[in-house]
A protein has these predicted regions:
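Ligand-binding pocket scaffold of soluble enzyme catalytic domains
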Residues: 12, 181-184
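Short, hydrophobic secondary-structure boundary micro-motifs
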Residues: 2-3, 27, 42, 171, ...
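Predominantly a Rossmann-like dinucleotide-binding segment in NAD(P)-dependent oxidoreductases
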Residues: 1, 6-103, 223
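Contiguous beta-strand/loop segments that form the cofactor/metal-binding neighborhood of enzyme cores
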Residues: 26, 65-155, 183-199, 213-216, ...
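Structured beta->alpha junctions
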Residues: 4-7, 34, 128-130, 205, ...
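Glycine- and charged-residue-rich phosphate/anionic-cofactor binding loop of Rossmann-like
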Residues: 3, 168-174, 192-209
């Protein structure tokens, strides 16, 4: 399986359940947002501001994969990016590059518009030049309700459902793997090979997400709409109800069989 595999966790699988059961009606739009401070992280993780990295490639996979696993492939993307505070000085005492000047090589702020094959329209906002406290948002707006998801970098972030004239309610998890379950994609792949079926964390979906981020950066550079060339088959949801560690409850891993 290909990372990230957090979409197989309790949070995103429950969100997928809500959408596929029609609890928000027909999905119309979606919105993903994350803000961090790589000015702090970058002082001891310098790869974050090098070419091939940045917040887009560091965190974008979690958000785009979560949406892809629910909404399917994209048709096109367009974007704007910027490098906020390009010239920096390392202020972390004890760091190998302490007091050295350095330059950000990649955008640390990006805003993208996305069109899915299904017709759903979405936006992606990523900013790594904000306060240290991380802010995340992942939402799908439907004709009959709104799905509010937690941090897709976690397996068990809370999921909320909002209906007309009502406050958002915490939706109970329908699936297992609520705790940190890194490696879940590889485990699901192993069970899939044993069963002779396609695994869910596929290279096709991962490549599509990879192309999406490249397309976003390319669109920002050339000012043109990026038409997606890759596609993938929407992965089936894991069977619901396998929540627990065995004993008097179902064991989570049985959902992978």
């Amino acid at each position: 399986g290909v990372a990230p595999d957090t979409f197989l966790g309790a949070s995103v699988q429950t969100a997928k359940y809500i959408v596929e059961k029609g609890l928000i009606g027909r999905p119309v739009t979606c919105r993903a947002s994350v803000s961090r401070n790589y000015g702090v992280y970058g002082e001891f993780l310098p790869h974050l501001y090098k070419k091939g990295a940045g917040i887009g490639f560091d965190m974008g996979g979690y958000y785009l994969t979560a949406l892809a696993s629910i909404l399917g492939p994209l048709k096109s993307v367009s974007a704007y990016t910027t490098i906020s505070g390009k010239q920096r000085v390392n202020t972390r005492v004890g760091a190998p590059m302490f007091e050295q000047h350095y330059e950000l090589e990649v955008p640390n702020v990006l805003v993208a518009a996305m069109q899915y094959d299904s017709g759903v329209l979405g936006t992606l906002h990523m900013n790594s030049d904000s306060i240290l406290d991380e802010r995340t948002s992942l939402e799908i707006y439907g004709t009959d309700g709104i799905l509010l998801m937690g941090d897709p970098n976690q397996f068990g972030a809370p999921v909320y459902l909002q209906k007309t004239n009502a406050q958002p309610i915490a939706f109970p998890f329908t699936h297992g793997f609520e705790q940190n379950s890194r490696g879940l994609g590889a485990a699901e792949m192993a069970w899939s090979i044993r069963a002779g079926r396609n695994h869910r964390a596929s290279k096709e979906m991962a490549f599509h997400v990879f192309e999406t981020m490249h397309g976003i950066l390319q669109s920002a550079e050339n000012g043109k709409l990026h038409m997606m060339e890759s596609t993938f088959t929407l992965p089936a949801a894991l069977p619901e109800g396998y929540i627990g560690d065995g004993g008097w409850t179902r064991i989570e891993e049985s959902a992978l069989i």
